[in-house]
Amino acid sequence: MRVGMAGHRTGGNKGDSMFQLSVVSIAVNDQDKARRFYEEVLGFKTRGEGDRGTQFAWILMSPPSGTAGVTLISPNARQQPGQAQGMMLKTLDIERLHDRLKEKGLEITDIGQASWGRFATFSDPDGNGWVIAVGSLDI
């Protein structure tokens, strides 16, 4: 076995790699409003923030479990609010999560069925699109 970047194993067993997805940046119009949505509706936790009051301000958030997070950033020439689409949150109990999100006032689609599993979609206050899903999505 060899050791690659950041001490991750390389080669060998399926699933070994030199990197993993860490953070996806999402442009939002109002970072404080977006933070409240991600905390209060989705249950995300704030993991860090910086450069407040500048065009480079960011807030790092992540779901209660999992290894990847999202960074709420200010709009810029390359990223505008509402452009991030299809980000997926995997769950083991889609009915329970769907009901909980509806109870919090979130506009969410009915649960649908696809060849890979069951899903529902919603958008954050800036129009960035999310999917909650259960099924054979493991990579």
Residue spans for each PLM region:
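Core segments of cupin and vicinal oxygen chelate
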Residues: 19, 25-67, 103
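Flexible, glycine-rich phosphate/dinucleotide-binding loops
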Residues: 53-55, 67, 79, 136-139
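Short secondary-structure boundary/capping segments
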Residues: 16, 49-51, 60-63, 76-80, ...
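Vicinal oxygen chelate
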Residues: 29-32, 64, 80-81, 85-129, ...
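Conserved beta-strand in the GNAT
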Residues: 70-73, 130-131
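N-terminal beta-strand motif that seeds the catalytic metal site of vicinal oxygen chelate
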Residues: 4-35, 84-87, 133-139
